[in-house]
Amino acid sequence: MILHITSHNFSQEVEQSTEPVLLDFWASWCMPCRRMGTVLESFAASHPQARIGKINVDEEPELAARFGVMSIPSLFVLHNGRVIRQAVGLQSTQQLEDLLS
């Protein structure tokens, strides 16, 4: 399942999660982001245990700034509220598995 993460639910869905959370910073006008969205949907369907959140940088500029997002798509894996891995650009399913391993 892919969650829509905002500044209002970030603490509950991400910081307080005991499971790793994969965050995708994206924008609707970004073509690589759209392709990444398709990859994430497929990944989520085949990995139902994975916690995945999408953050629209245009709607949540504070969160994008907090993570220092300069390019999109940008992916971050957080565990216990701390960034443990990150990647920039379109990622494959295998790369997503590697990020979450």
Task: Describe the residue ranges of each PLM region.
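Conserved redox-active cysteine motifs that mediate thiol-disulfide chemistry
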Residues: 25-38
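Conserved helix-turn-beta segment immediately C-terminal to the redox Cys motif
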Residues: 18-20, 37-55, 61
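A short beta-strand-turn-helix
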Residues: 3-20, 61
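Residue-level signature of catalytic and energy-coupling elements of molecular machines
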Residues: 10, 23, 40, 56, ...
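Non-catalytic, surface beta->alpha helical segment in thiol-disulfide oxidoreductase systems
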Residues: 77-101
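Structural micro-motif
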Residues: 61, 67-76, 94
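Conserved Rossmann-like nucleotide-binding pocket used by diverse enzymes
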Residues: 1, 6, 26, 53
